[in-house]
Swiss-Prot record:
It is found in: Cytoplasm. The keyword Ligase applies. It comes from Streptococcus mutans serotype c (strain ATCC 700610 / UA159). GO terms for molecular function: ATP binding; UDP-N-acetylmuramoylalanine-D-glutamate ligase activity. HAMAP family: MurD. Pathway: Cell wall biogenesis; peptidoglycan biosynthesis. One of its GO terms (biological process) is regulation of cell shape. Cell wall formation. Catalyzes the addition of glutamate to the nucleotide precursor UDP-N-acetylmuramoyl-L-alanine (UMA). Keywords: ATP-binding, Cell cycle, Cell division, Cell shape, Cell wall biogenesis/degradation, Cytoplasm, Ligase, Nucleotide-binding, Peptidoglycan synthesis. PANTHER family: UDP-N-ACETYLMURAMOYLALANINE--D-GLUTAMATE LIGASE. It comes from the Bacteria. This is UDP-N-acetylmuramoylalanine--D-glutamate ligase. ATP binds at residues 119-125.
Amino acid sequence: MKHVKNFENKKVLVLGLARSGEAAARLLAKLGAIVTVNDGKPFDENPSAQALLEEGIKVICGSHPLELLDEAFAYMVKNPGIPYTNPMVVRALEKNIPVITEVELAYLISEAPIIGITGSNGKTTTTTMIADVLNHAGQSARLSGNIGFPASEVAQPVTEKDILVMELSSFQLMGTESFHPHMAVITNLMPTHIDYHGSFENYIEAKWNIQKNMTKEDFLVLNFNQDLAKDLANQTQAKIIPFSTKEKVDGAYLDGQMLCFKGQAIMSASELGVPGSHNVENALATIAVAKLSGVSNEAIRETLIHFGGVKHRLQSLGNIAGVKFYNDSKSTNILATQKALSGFDNSKVILIAGGLDRGNEFDELVPDIKGLKKMIILGESAPRLKHAAVQAGVTYLNAKDVAQATRIAFQEASPGDVVLLSPANASWDMYKNFEVRGDEFITTFKSLKGE
């Protein structure tokens, strides 16, 4: 790694732990910083803080005392999930203390070039696709960032022979100053995380940070299905490589059923290992990055044919007696479930849906569920989903949890059918998170397969 001098003998406050904060604290100590960690969780319930203290790093836990900022900190490294309205962050900015995220640290020390991927939907799938394609082609791609591997940790051992493929959230990008990927992708831009950013305009501004240090030597891959992306394309120094499923563009595009790049047919959309129109978009973004990285058409096709998806994101589990199972537990809203259903023939789909009741009516889901073979409904939102099923003319059955729903769905299925867990709701009424919900689906699938 690059041994940058930016933090040497400087006081740095790491605000918020979790994996990224813990990794940042260790890295800063390696770089010679005088590190203080502040986390809201009490010390005796905080194994990360305990481990850092044993390593000689100062930790203050249980609250966020504003007087802590009376010290002359040169930087604050903020956990991405902590909003800028947090009193500690507000006070730091008032004192002109630079507030950064650990992604900025990763960039400063990385010897490897960076491919950054952001967007409202499809980030994780596209990031994983890109890394898989590059690795299949014999390159050395390392996943990092919002995908679960702290960027500042992954960046330490890499060399110029590696490539950091980094998933980036708007929260992370807000805390960047010099961050400069040589290639970047914005999958799409939808009005999300408005509670954090305050407005859609602020959210776009945070996402747009991905390109702010890019030059004409760099490449920015944008989704030209969106007029917003076309407008933004005029506001960057980077070379634009568009992708689209609606028109032929000077980049990656869908021509009939063929996925193409600048006139070359790469593969048929029907060959993709994951279904859904959104995954065609993800694949096109991947193709653009792969071709810019010198990957052969054959290597791209081989990878995308066998790509089984990312865990809990329209993940293909396999089949039992000709019935296919897909785990899309990450679909915590209506739009995500609509996209999941777009990849299937409704007459063969048994949909498992329901979860936390946020007061949503499901009227906009009605056109998408028409013609479903059946629905298995569970959770707090069950009454509202049942109403939507009746409107759509779909037969539904009740289940107490995902395990029971999966068994009922399999009993109702015939060879050639699809059992799809795509809840259209958050999980917190019954499960700690969508991962636990999805894991229950996977466990039940494995149990059924073994019976």
